[in-house]
Amino acid sequence: MSNHQSFTRRSFLKSAAVLGAVMAAQPAALSLAAAKKEKFKISLAQWSLNKRFLKRPGAEPLDNLEFAKIARSVGIDGVEYVNQMFKDKAKDEAYLGEMKKRAAGEGVKSLLIMCDGEGSIGAPQEAARAKTVESHLKWLDAAKFLGCHSIRVNAASDAKLAWNEQAKLAADGLHRLGLEADKRGLWVVVENHGGTSSNGKWLVQVMQAADHKRVGILPDFGNFYTDRVKSEMYNPYQGLREFMPWVKEAVSAKAYDWDTGAGKFYTEDRREKIEMTLDYERLIKIVVAAGYSGYIGIEYEGQKHSEIDGIKRTKQALEEIRAML
């Protein structure tokens, strides 16, 4: 072999090695860039389309089994179910199997089930609390079957009782439910959902008293009215900061009307006896600063836009804010 041939071959091998290293590094670099850009993922709460799923007068009806397809149609890959939409199907394996099949077919993850109408978790009577816990077990089982990570419950008690007594009772019910959730590897998350549960300090007190690793909070950006009749509202930014240490795998991005003139990332609720403006950018920054990087779920309840348009507008706001972080 001549010196020229040896040099050429060495040069080729060296160049090939360098090129190979560059090409191998590119996917990793792109992956890191994508991971850095996306501080959180976006999901869709079924309640955003509640008028259609519950077949309200004047609303074009939707079947619960269509939910995953709708989420995918607007570019969303995570869904949060509402038990009201399939209330009598909690133990129907064939039906749940069809839900699971459709979600998988759309490439959509089933994240949680929001549970209402199953009793008061903080009922003053021992028997009533026990019954409420029992009533939620079928939803824990359904969530497990669907591949969800959580069920969302309400920390309701008797409003006539003292603050501390309500907290004690709610914590007792939640602890019991947390024990059941732990057997299934699931979370039980409480939403700030009106009354005392919308008071940040009260709900944190409940979490401390419940004292179970499987019990946490699902913060809702818009549910901070402690008394709508009196227009009494807990500071949503303070409340969100107080809730974040207790958040597991879900945050609810409640949204109302967009493009109202308040600002690009402001959403406003102007229903009767309600006057609320939410700074989405500020709220999202609180969530991300707390180290949360999971799904943030769109829950649209506005009046100005159609349900689908409201979902799309909320998604756009979340994506634009995410790109800025």
What are these regions (language model features)?
Residues 2-20:
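N-terminal secretory signal peptides and thylakoid transit peptides that target proteins
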Residues 63-82, 147:
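Catalytic domains of carbohydrate-active enzymes, especially glycoside hydrolases
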